[in-house]
Amino acid sequence: MILVVNLNPSLDKIYTLDELPYGEASRAQTVQNTAGGKGTHVANVITALGSPCTVVGFLGGYVGQYIRHVLDKRRIVHHCTTIEGETRSCINIATSDGKQTEVLEPGPTITEGEKTEFLAQYDFELKRSDLVVASGSLPKGIGDDFYKELICRAKAQGKPFLLDTSGSALTKGLEALPYFIKPNESEVEVLTGHKLTNLNEAVQVLHELEGRGIAMPTISLGKKGALLAHEGKVYRAVPPTVDTVINAVGSGDSFVAGLATALDRGASPEEALRLAAACGTANVLEAESGVVDPEKVAAIEKEVQITTL
């Protein structure tokens, strides 16, 4: 069973308008409300692929109740810590000229008591899990080294920890040597101090990360696919070209979910990378973020090209 850590979930609201004139009232043509947060997306995809998972994290207020309702509706098991604050909302305003304006709420501040309660629940669920996936940013109040603590607790029980985050949360998390990380090209630049200009440089970074003790470092290359290193070998996945991208938000989360699902099933690194790439590509074919159609995933999976570099 996969344990999904979703510390900073959100209600994602998407408004579509013809235009957004500054300082005037605007009437939306459509409104879409979805349970968001990278961990929510991961849980959606793992469940769609037919694997069991449990979500832990923080939820509070009316938004928290809504997210619990969505998880229940999708039959995703969740044991989230109830907090006094209100779970954040993220608003995306899309206009007919193709531009998008986002308003991101700061989110709640987690208290020391809520943090302690979460850790107790995490330790309990950890015993029943085979693999841990932690995705997304950290809420205020718990410190940049919180993922590092979760990784250490998982490693103490021999559970692989897949970390997908950025910034100081990633930098601190790396100190505990998670099993897997998935920075994109810009995040690699932050980690290493230099910009990647070719595949050879990316391969070298992966070897360096593996040499530090990260068992399966991965670099996301966007439309160009992804690179994954394991036991001295580097694999590249190139997914098929998609004619029409409906919504690319959540593709990275879908990638992580596919990889976690495959690893939980005992797949080889190549097989895991293939499913991950297929899930990331399948996500762009859906209107809702972090959602895949298993039949589309299976079809795309056959077309993903895996090579050894």
Regions found by a protein language model. Give the residues of each.
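Conserved phosphate/ATP/ADP-binding segment of small-molecule kinases
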Residues: D145-V234
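Conserved N-terminal subdomain of the carbohydrate kinase-like
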Residues: E24, A48-S129, A298-L309
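Glycine-rich phosphate/adenosyl-contacting loop at the front of the ribokinase-like
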Residues: M1-V56, V63-Y66
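Short, small-residue-enriched loops and turns at beta-alpha junctions
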Residues: P108-T111, L138-I142, A169-T171, V190, ...
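Hydrophobic alpha-helical segments and helix pairs
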Residues: T111-E149, P160
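Short beta-strands and strand-loop turn motifs
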Residues: E102-L104, S129-G136, D164, K182-E187
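Conserved phosphate-binding/catalytic region of the ribokinase-like
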Residues: T171, L199-L309
